[in-house]
Regions:
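Membrane-embedded and interfacial regions of multi-pass energy-transducing membrane proteins
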Residues: 2-634
Length: 634
């Protein structure tokens, strides 16, 4: 797939030879079972309200030990323990840890090769999207008619909450996880990430949180919705403990991954790769993780405090006892709105990366693209309170936050103009990744324009909490973000898998899902404008036709995505063998062989031109390769 798999497996590895996903699951189960038993004896297994603190302590301890056991069983702590004991890692150990010559087995192990980690992220993301999509179908089925009720109100809210947080996790990692890991190190001329073990650690932390999150189904669910507002969170069943632990683990994973990516790009770029020669996708990934590094710890802090309230009787969020639930709302949205751009920026950057390839002309105003990305990052941390207009918190700040929210349309508009300017008079090569750009632009316009309206206090007062808001953020996160990720999959598929993507089958899936998407959320715009609220399953007959339309559209999305996933599997297993550079692209990942060697380059490259010089006579098609020491410059 990505590296040569023939030849003897290295003799090194030590205990790592016996650790894999199976041992991780076994150790996690044993640790969790022991923790549950001991914690139950200490704090009680009672289910009544009089034992709520003890019950939550039991589950949080159980989930914590599950995660520790899982990470122990996968081998995440072997390296640190060896370092503490003063044992150096041999070359054979390093090669084994990188997955050399281990075939498919390396995808089920703690493997440090950034290409393997990228593929692991891709598979995990697809599984999360499938689970989240199934939950979405259950939600829309419940809403198809005012007389249809497959859930009770509490279960409906729990399903909505679980769907929301699964999809948020999936969309956050859908581009930076697979392609930030697989592509970025090659794209900047590096042999691997700066911290390969931390790279693998970030991935397996994500895997460890999936069972914790899904356990909420059996613990009363997440009836608060994905935002888990207080005091609802403190009153929720033990499924809320699953939510708390999921967010804590995810924040740790995101911080580790973000620091690793930023360090890699800053310190390991190839000689000659100045910032003006650095591909725009690299900028997008760095901006995304750079925004996540300060944003997600605030989310983590909000959940730590919530966990303390649930397990020790503190009242940080209990207004009646002297706490303040606005504290939670501020901490949550300090993460919640930057998180939108953590998702959106790398998806748009991926499309800006390959757009010049398919129009055979340079990216229009590279500097404007960089400034637009930087502007979004800067303003995204100054708009969080537009989610709080209706809460009564600091009403004197409504106007300033309305202004900053409207201002963020300026840098996003700059990115839109970069797309349009690049398309202008280009010689379009109408392959499926290119056509996805048109779909994204349509969705991006709708998501952006509806967002401008919602930024105004009077409009927000009328539409806040309605299906209109649901449609708006789906047009942004799914219509632009997910479509960008699908385009990235189609574009880099030949390099990741060594095979061409089946554009016929994949095209059917893509366009069916796009038709369904617009039908679904146009219907939601309509019922939202008419007044249908979010977060409740019962509604007036006034909204029934719109919900029938939206549900039919949702089924269409699901069918289209299943076809698209089938195209991925079919192409991966039996697709046409790809050449090293089927698109005729100039960036470094397309200049190395397919499958990509373990260390990416036999000799490290020296960059002599920008990556978008299509149609420029003096622009060289390939970088100069010269044997130099590993490393780069800041």
């Amino acid at each position: 797939m990505t590296t040569t798999t023939r030849g003897p497996i290295p003799n090194g590895g030590g205990i790592m030879r016996r650790l894999n996903l199976g041992t991780a699951l076994l150790c996690g189960f044993i640790f969790a079972l022991v923790g549950w038993f001991i914690a139950g004896k200490l704090f009680g297994f009672g289910e009544g309200p009089e034992n709520a603190w003890g019950r939550d302590r039991v589950w949080i301890i159980t989930m914590t030990l599950w995660a520790l056991g899982f990470m122990t069983g996968i081998g995440a702590f072997v390296g640190p323990v060896r370092w503490v004991m003063g044992k150096d890692q041999k070359f054979e150990d390093q090669m084994y840890l990188a997955g050399k010559n281990q075939g498919v087995a390396r995808y089920f192990k703690f493997t440090t090769d950034h290409k393997v980690v990228g593929i692991q992220y891709l598979i995990v993301t697809m599984l999360l999207f499938f689970v989240g999509g199934v939950l979405a179908m259950l939600i829309r089925t419940d809403l198809i008619s005012k007389n249809t009720e497959i859930f009770g109100p509490q279960t409906y809210n729990a399903v909505v909450g679980l769907h929301g947080i699964i999809m948020i996790v999936a969309t956050i990692i859908m581009v930076t996880g697979p392609f930030g890991n697989f592509v970025v190190p090659i794209m900047i001329g590096a042999r691997d990430m700066a911290f390969p073990r931390l790279n693998a650690l970030s991935l397996w932390l994500i895997v460890s949180l999936v069972p914790i999150l899904l356990s909420a189904i059996f613990l009363g669910g997440i009836p608060t919705g994905w935002s888990a507002y207080e005091p609802l969170g403190s009153q929720a069943p033990p499924g809320m403990d699953s939510y708390i632990m999921t967010i804590i683990i995810f924040a740790i994973s995101s911080g580790v991954a973000g620091a690793n990516i930023v360090t890699t790009v800053v310190k390991m770029r190839a000689r000659g790769m100045t910032w003006n020669r650095t591909p725009i996708f690299v900028y997008g990934v760095v901006a995304s993780v750079g925004l996540a590094i300060p944003a997600f710890p605030t989310f983590m802090a909000s959940q730590v405090i919530s966990g303390v309230d649930r397990t020790t009787g503190t009242v940080f969020y209990d207004t009646a006892a002297g706490g303040n639930d606005w504290l939670y709302t501020n901490l949550f949205w300090l993460m919640g709105h930057p998180e939108v751009y953590v998702i959106l920026i790398p998806a748009l950057a991926a499309m800006m990366e390959y757009l010049p390839v398919f129009v055979r002309k340079p990216l229009f105003n590279f500097n404007a693209a960089v400034i637009g990305i930087a502007g979004i990052v800067g303003l995204s941390v100054m708009v969080w309170a537009h989610h709080m207009y209706m809460t009564g918190w600091a009403p004197n700040l409504n106007a300033p936050f309305m202004l900053t929210t409207e201002l963020i349309s300026v840098p996003t508009g700059m990115l839109f103009l970069v797309f349009v300017g690049t398309l202008w008079r280009g010689k379009v090569w109408a392959r499926l990744p290119m056509l996805a750009v048109y779909a994204m632009l349509w969705n991006f316009i709708i998501g952006g324009l509806t967002g401008i309206y919602l930024s105004d206090v009077p409009v927000d007062v009328a539409l806040h909490g309605s299906m209109y808001v649901t449609a708006h953020f789906h047009y942004t996160l799914m219509g632009a973000g997910l479509v960008g990720a699908m385009g990235a999959v189609m574009y880099w598929f030949p390099k990741v898998t060594g095979r061409m993507f089946d554009e016929k089958l994949g095209g059917w899936g893509f366009w069916i899902s796009q038709v369904g998407f617009n039908v679904t959320f146009m219907g939601m715009f309509a019922v939202g404008l008419a007044g249908q609220p979010r977060r409740v399953s019962a509604y007036s007959s006034l909204f029934e036709k719109g919900n029938i339309v939206s549900t039919m559209g949702a089924y269409t999305i699901f069918i289209g995505m299943l076809i698209f996933f089938a195209a991925i599997v079919r192409s991966w297993t039996s697709g046409e063998i790809a050449t090293s550079n089927p698109w005729g692209a100039k960036t470094l990942e397309w200049q190395v062989p397919t499958p990509v060697p373990l260390e990416n380059f036999e000799v490290l490259p020296i960059i002599t031109s920008d990556p978008y010089g299509y149609g420029v006579p003096e622009s060289k098609p390939e970088p100069v390769l010269e044997s130099v020491d590993a490393g780069g410059h800041s």
